C-alpha cells in the first residue's frame, strides 16, 4: 500500500489538530457538571455517554495524519482504562495540554529530547508527591470514591460500598442490566477465576472485548479436547436446546477449537471455550468445585466418564457467564446452595487436616471462591440509552473504588494535581535550559483538569485556580464553594491520578519528539460489483477440512454420518 509522508512542523501540526479534535470532545465530560456526548450507532438508537474512553474509541478523522494524532490520545485513554479502570478523561486532558505546550516550545526552537527529559524528571517527583499525600481507605471512603467517580450519584456510592462489605473488597462484583427501572444489589452464588477465552472469535461484545452468555449450559472436563468427534453429541443436543454453551476443559485446540469458532461465527451455536483454572490435581479440584456450584458433572477418566456419552443432564447451568481475555466470572443460580455449603464444609475439614502452609493457602482460596459469592449490581433506567450510560458510570465507579483500596485516596476535583504542580517550583529552580522548560510544561498541564472542571460548572477557570491557591482549599464544582475536599468526601483514587499523569506524559513526550509521520494513502473507492452477488462466493461446509462425518451435524457445517 502506498504511503503518505509528512515532515517537521507540518507533521506535528497535523498530529496536534488530531489530538485537539479528540480531546475537545472528551473534556466536556470532566467533573460533576460535565456534559454528555451523543454517539451515532450504525444500528439502533444513538448512545448518550459521559465516559472518556467510550467517546475516544468512537472518533475517526478524515485526514490520515490528524487521525494518527487522535489514535495516540486514544491510546492514553485505553491504557489508563486498562490499568486503573477510570481516569480516562483526566489523562486525555493532561495529554492535550502537554502536547500543546510541548509543540509550541518545539516550534520556538527548543530541543524535543531535552523537553522530554525535563518532563520525565518532573513526573517522577509528581508520583513521589502523590504517594506522600495518599491516605489509606477507611470508614466511609469507599462510598465517597464511588460517588465521585459515578458523577455524584449517592445511590451508586452506597450500593458499591454495600457490595464490597458483603463479598469483601477482593470479592467478585459484576454489573448487569436490569429488567426493571430500579437499580438493585443482589448477592448470589458464583465464582471467578483467571482464565479467559481460548479464541478472541468468541467475543460477543466487541466494544468491551468480552463474551457474555445468559442462562448458559456448561461442559466440565479435565481432558484436552482436540478432535471434534468428542464434542459432536453434546453440540447437537445443545443446539436443539437453544442454550449457549461454555466448554471448560484442560484445553480446547486444533480441529475442535476451529469448528467451535466457525459455528459460533456462522450463528449456528452460541459457544465459547475456556481453559480450566489451576494445574494438575488442583485443576481437578477446581473443576469439581465449579461442578458443585453449577449442578453439573465433571467428565473425567477417574470416573470412567467419556465425552461422547455426555447428556444434557450432565451439563452445569448458570445464570450468566462473562469471559474476558484474562478472566471468567460464573454467576450461578440459587438451586445448589446446600451442595455448595456441604462442599465448603468438606474443604474446611481438609484444611484442618493439612500441615502445609501452601496447601492451606490454596484451600482457603477455594473456600473464598465458593463461599464468597458474587455481588450483582442490576442497573435499571427508563430508556435503553440512559441504562447504557448509567452502566458505564457504575463500572467506572467500581474500578475507581478498587484502585482506591490498592493505593489510597487523595483530595479530588483536580486539587491534588494543582498542589503537585506548585510543588514542582523547586525542581524548576534546580534545572535550566530546555529541561527546565519541560518541567514547566508538566506544571501548566497539571492545572488543566481543574480549569476544565470549573469551566464545565459555569465558572471562570483562571479565577477558580487563583482562588484555590490563595485559600489553600479545593473547589467543589457541585456547590461552587471552596472547602476541604477530603473532609467533604470529594476524593480520587491515588492510583487513578498516578496512571493518568504517567500515561499522559508517556504519549505526549513521544509525540513532541516526532519528526516524520507516515500514514497509509487512502485508496479510491472500488466500483460497485455488477449483479450484487457475493464476491466471496460462500465458504462451503466444513467437509473441506477433511473431517469425517460426525453424526447429523450437517447443519453445523459438517456432513452427516451414515
Swiss-Prot record:
What is the superkingdom listed in this entry's lineage?
Bacteria
- Please provide the Gene Ontology terms (biological process) for this protein: protein refolding
Task: Write down the chemical reaction(s) this protein catalyses.
Answer: ATP + H2O + a folded polypeptide = ADP + phosphate + an unfolded polypeptide
Record Gene3D superfamilies: GroEL, GroEL-like equatorial domain, TCP-1-like chaperonin intermediate domain
Alphabetized GO MF terms: ATP binding; ATP-dependent protein folding chaperone; isomerase activity; unfolded protein binding
**Does the entry feature the keyword Ribonucleoprotein, yes or no?**
no
Q: Which PROSITE patterns match?
A: CHAPERONINS_CPN60
Give the family this protein belongs to, as stated in its UniProt record: Belongs to the chaperonin (HSP60) family.
The entry's function note states: Together with its co-chaperonin GroES, plays an essential role in assisting protein folding. The GroEL-GroES system forms a nano-cage that allows encapsulation of the non-native substrate proteins and provides a physical environment optimized to promote and accelerate protein folding.
Q: What is this protein called?
A: Chaperonin GroEL 2
Q: What is the lineage of its organism?
A: Bacteria, Bacillati, Cyanobacteriota, Cyanophyceae, Synechococcales
Q: Which gene encodes it?
A: groEL2
Amino acid at each position: 500500500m502506498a504511503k503518505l509522508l509528512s515532515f517537521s512542523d507540518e507533521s506535528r501540526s497535523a498530529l496536534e489538530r488530531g489530538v485537539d479534535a479528540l480531546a475537545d470532545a472528551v473534556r466536556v465530560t470532566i467533573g460533576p457538571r460535565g456534559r454528555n456526548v451523543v454517539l451515532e450507532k450504525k444500528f439502533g438508537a444513538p448512545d448518550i455517554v459521559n465516559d472518556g474512553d467510550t467517546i475516544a474509541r468512537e472518533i475517526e478523522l478524515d485526514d490520515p495524519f490528524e487521525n494518527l494524532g487522535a489514535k495516540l490520545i486514544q491510546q492514553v485513554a485505553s491504557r489508563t482504562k486498562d490499568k486503573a479502570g477510570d481516569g480516562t478523561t483526566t489523562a486525555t486532558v493532561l495529554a492535550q495540554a502537554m502536547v500543546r505546550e510541548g509543540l509550541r516550545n518545539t516550534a520556538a526552537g527548543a530541543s524535543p529530547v531535552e523537553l522530554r527529559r525535563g518532563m520525565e524528571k518532573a513526573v517522577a517527583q509528581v508520583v513521589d508527591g502523590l504517594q506522600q499525600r495518599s491516605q489509606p481507605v477507611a470508614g466511609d471512603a469507599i462510598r465517597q470514591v464511588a460517588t465521585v467517580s459515578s458523577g455524584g450519584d449517592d445511590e451508586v456510592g452506597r450500593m458499591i460500598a454495600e457490595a464490597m462489605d458483603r463479598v469483601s473488597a477482593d470479592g467478585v462484583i459484576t454489573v448487569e442490566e436490569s429488567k426493571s427501572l430500579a437499580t438493585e444489589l443482589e448477592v448470589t452464588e458464583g465464582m471467578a477465576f483467571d482464565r479467559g477465552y481460548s479464541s478472541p472469535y468468541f467475543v460477543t461484545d466487541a466494544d468491551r472485548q468480552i463474551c457474555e452468555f445468559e442462562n448458559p449450559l456448561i461442559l466440565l472436563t479435565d481432558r484436552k479436547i482436540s478432535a471434534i468427534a468428542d464434542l459432536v453429541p453434546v453440540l447437537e443436543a445443545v443446539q436443539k436446546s437453544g442454550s449457549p454453551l461454555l466448554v471448560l476443559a484442560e484445553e480446547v485446540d486444533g480441529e475442535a477449537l476451529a469448528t467451535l469458532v466457525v459455528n459460533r461465527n456462522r450463528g449456528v451455536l452460541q459457544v465459547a471455550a475456556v481453559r480450566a483454572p489451576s494445574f494438575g490435581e488442583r485443576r481437578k479440584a477446581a473443576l469439581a468445585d465449579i461442578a458443585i456450584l453449577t449442578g453439573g458433572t465433571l467428565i473425567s477418566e477417574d470416573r470412567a466418564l467419556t465425552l461422547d456419552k455426555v447428556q444434557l443432564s450432565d451439563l452445569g447451568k448458570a445464570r450468566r457467564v462473562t469471559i474476558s481475555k484474562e478472566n471468567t466470572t460464573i454467576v450461578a443460580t440459587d438451586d445448589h446452595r446446600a451442595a455448595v455449603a456441604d462442599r465448603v464444609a468438606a474443604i474446611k475439614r481438609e484444611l484442618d487436616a493439612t500441615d502445609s502452609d501452601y496447601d492451606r493457602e490454596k484451600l482457603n482460596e477455594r473456600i473464598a471462591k465458593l463461599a464468597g459469592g458474587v455481588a450483582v449490581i442490576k442497573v435499571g433506567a427508563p430508556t435503553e440509552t440512559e441504562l447504557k450510560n448509567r452502566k458505564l458510570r457504575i463500572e467506572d465507579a467500581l474500578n475507581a473504588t478498587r484502585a482506591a483500596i490498592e493505593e489510597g485516596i487523595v483530595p479530588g476535583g483536580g486539587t491534588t494535581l494543582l498542589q503537585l504542580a506548585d510543588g514542582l517550583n523547586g525542581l524548576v529552580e534546580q534545572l535550566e535550559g530546555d529541561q527546565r522548560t519541560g518541567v514547566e510544561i508538566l506544571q501548566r498541564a497539571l492545572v488543566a483538569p481543574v480549569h476544565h472542571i470549573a469551566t464545565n460548572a459555569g465558572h471562570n477557570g483562571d479565577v477558580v485556580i487563583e482562588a484555590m491557591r490563595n485559600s489553600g482549599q479545593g473547589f467543589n464544582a457541585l456547590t461552587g464553594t471552596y472547602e476541604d475536599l477530603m473532609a467533604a468526601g470529594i476524593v480520587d483514587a491515588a492510583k487513578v491520578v498516578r496512571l493518568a499523569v504517567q500515561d499522559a506524559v508517556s504519549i505526549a513526550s513521544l509525540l513532541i519528539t516526532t519528526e516524520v509521520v507516515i500514514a497509509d494513502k487512502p485508496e479510491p473507492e472500488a466500483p460497485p460489483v455488477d449483479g450484487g452477488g457475493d464476491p466471496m462466493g460462500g465458504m462451503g461446509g466444513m467437509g473441506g477440512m477433511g473431517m469425517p462425518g460426525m453424526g447429523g451435524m450437517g447443519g453445523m457445517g459438517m456432513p452427516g454420518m451414515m
